[in-house]
Amino acid sequence: MPVWSAVGVGLHLLSLVYAGTVAHASLAGMTEVPNIRELAEIPAVEVITRSAVMLMSAAAEKLGLSAEDPDESPQRDLDEARRLITALAGLVTASAEYLGPHAGPVRDGLKTLQLAFRESSAAPDEPGQGPGEKYTGPVW
């Protein structure tokens, strides 16, 4: 899969940050030492979105998309990627109505990962049998 496709997932997420729909600090907190906040103070949509971003990032790593050559990435693990993408699909499907303006970019990121998985597989799954497709339907 071309690296630019993986970058597309990140760009969608960055567009959420810079559009003001997600606080930059809330996404930065996943990679830096976060400010301590009471869990009860965090809106549900932020918890769901942060979880989706974490699943997307982990799946991209397991697909080897952070490497110049994904096929040679030491982090590449398609079995783990399948699990992460399926978990992401379940979360996105179950929470789409609550995500508001975040739903579209999160779904786009999910689809990009599903397509990247299909391209990475030596023997691609039949349509509808790929990771998360039991929740999203077949991905083309």
List each language-model region with its residue ranges.
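Residue-identity detector for glycine
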Residues: 8-10, 20
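A charge-rich, low-complexity, intrinsically flexible signal that marks solvent-exposed coils, linkers
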Residues: 26-140
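Ubiquitous "structural anchor" signal
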Residues: 16-18, 67
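Short, positively charged and aromatic/hydrophobic N-terminal segments
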Residues: 18-21, 26
